[in-house]
Amino acid sequence: MLHGRLRDILRLLMAAEAPVTSSFFAAQLNVTTRTVRNDIKELQGVLSGHGAFVQSVRGSGYKLRIDDEQVFRTLLQDEFQQKKGLPVLPEERMAYLMKRLLLADHYLKLDELAEELFISKSTLQTDLKEVKKRLLPYRIVMETRPNYGFKLRGDEVQMRYCMAEYIVDERETEIDVLNEKADILPKEEIEIIRSAILKKMKNDRIPLSNMGLNNLIIHIAIACKRIRTENYVSLFPKDMDHILHQKEYQAAEAIVKELESKLSVTFPKDETAYITMHLLGTKRMTQSQCGEDTFSIEEETDQLTLAMIKAVDRELKLGILHDKELKIGLALHMKPAISRNRYGMNLRNPMLAAIKEHYPLAFEAGIIAGIVIKEQTGIEIHENEIGYLALHFGAAIERKKTESPPKRCIIVCASGAGSAQLLREKLRSHFGKRLDILGTAEYYSLDQMSYESIDFVISTIPIKKELPVPVLKVNTILGGTDFTKIESILSDEKEKANRYLKKELVFFQEDLRSKEEVIQFLGQKVVECGFADEEIIDSIFEREDMSPTCFGNLVAIPHPLVPQTKTTFWAVCTLKKPIDWESQRVQFVCLLCVEKENKADLQSMYKLLGSILDDPAAMNQLIKCRSYQELSDVFDQKMLS
């Protein structure tokens, strides 16, 4: 019932807390506002009778209203769980074309492919230019033959890596849904591969993570498919010699023996070595998953891990230097990671986009760790690998939060002792040990109190006096918004944007057409204002080369690879029209500059930025801003909401 673009509009409406304009939808979807209005009219027809409707709010935009949650939920289940048909959005077509070309064992004709997708030849040719860009890192080319059409050519190992990345939907992590989406092998054969791997892993007591197992199944399934069409890998003698001396080679031989008998596929020696490469590069379980006695860490890996943690803690001030679980988790991750790099393997990371969007601080920690790895080993870490490193650092950040001492407060309540007692018990019940309530106080006594041991005041009445600590006004009978206000204090989320914004470095509706133009523009403005040297621009591009800083929701947050400035601040720019920033559309750019030798905890700043990344309505407001004060107010309102 809903084609791809309608699904995306519905997703954006569901995520927005405030009305969203047609221009915001147009920028996100790369269509005109007229197309958006037509789409919303079509969406309205679908939602009619399904418990929801799109409300047009005069002067503000569109908002989703839900009348019957149960009926609406049924619609969502029907729409989002059914198998997708033909692609509609450009990004959907990219994914379709990549799969189509990679799986084709014959030449494809332009006319036939355009007809298959219900698009014009010119649109298809534009799409194929983007396909060629995506094939470039794998050194795969599109070979054209007159009267026949075109097909892909490249090194077999790289072809298989590309297939693993693009044939299987990167969001799918469970192997039982991989087969129906990817069409690599029949389901029964996938099960045979899974059983052969698990049998050997169990016999040899090799601990394997669920994601590691799934990646291994994918690569072996692709190998089977390619061998059947007589496409074989050929490894360098140096690599073969190294692989043959690994204990994993024997495990690969056992798996191959079972597959040959059950799948009627013959694996040459190089193909067995290819499976060994993936066994060497497979993610293993962590210490907590497989027990103390099932792993050992080499001295070299131990030292590298410690250097990574020290660098991250020095740059970001996370207080994670003595986190034993982090050290063990990273060390266990590094050995297969180094093997993956040795053989040019690119581990799929279905969580990468979510990690970058929701855990920007942890991802930055992964970037810093990647720099250390390159400095000490010469290994260039891929973006997917950085995402996995970020997970380890993100877990350490969360563990650190639980170690924080409780916040201390007093209660001011004008309704009497009974109300104060109810309020106190409700707070204790909700926040537990995170909140230490020192007692209650009368309004008139606030001037005589010492606030040295008090972090904030909770009051059921307005307090007009200036107090040296924050005051939170709540209802006597606590509600959801009251808890949210208190949570923001307990989580140290109360951060003001004007602490980082500088009027001379905020620009609106700039007519810039590319990522390079935007970075050059903002970097040059920072230099002209005397906040950094010219080197900052090169450093920003270096960081961008490691991993694009676009996060979806029309946002990009570029920054130097290493801190370059005397203070921590933002340079902000909105654009007249969205631009392509790698794989995302971007219209709001925040150049993040962190102080050299920074000693401050930046977690609250990253939370402030993260709150904007997650909110389409807030981003819509920021893009419409025309003054510094408007921009600052949107940020502050977001933190209060």
UniProtKB/Swiss-Prot annotation:
What Gene3D superfamilies is this protein classified in? 3.40.50.2300, Mannitol-specific EII, Chain A, PRD domain, Winged helix-like DNA-binding domain superfamily/Winged helix DNA-binding domain
- Modified residues annotated as Phosphohistidine in this record: 219, 278, 333, 392, 559
The record places domain PTS EIIB type-2 at: 407-498
A Gene Ontology molecular function term of the record? RNA binding
Q: Where does the record place the PTS EIIA type-2 domain?
A: 499-638
Q: InterPro entries recorded for this chain?
A: BglG_antiterminators (IPR050661), HTH_11 (IPR013196), Mga_HTH (IPR007737), PRD (IPR011608), PRD_sf (IPR036634), PTrfase/Anion_transptr (IPR016152), PTS_EIIA_type-2_dom (IPR002178), PTS_EIIB-like_sf (IPR036095)
> List-wise, which residues carry Phosphocysteine?
413
Could you tell me which residue ranges the PRD domain spans? 184-289, 296-403
Q: What is its EC number?
A: 2.7.1.-
Looking up Pfam families in the UniProt record yields:
HTH_11 (PF08279), Mga (PF05043), PRD (PF00874), PTS_EIIA_2 (PF00359)
Keyword Transcription among UniProt keywords: yes
Effect of altering residue 333 to A?
Loss of activity
Reported function: Positive regulator of the licABCH operon.
Family label: Belongs to the transcriptional antiterminator BglG family.
Please state what the protein is called.
Probable licABCH operon regulator
The scientific name of the source species is Bacillus subtilis (strain 168)
Per the record, the gene is licR
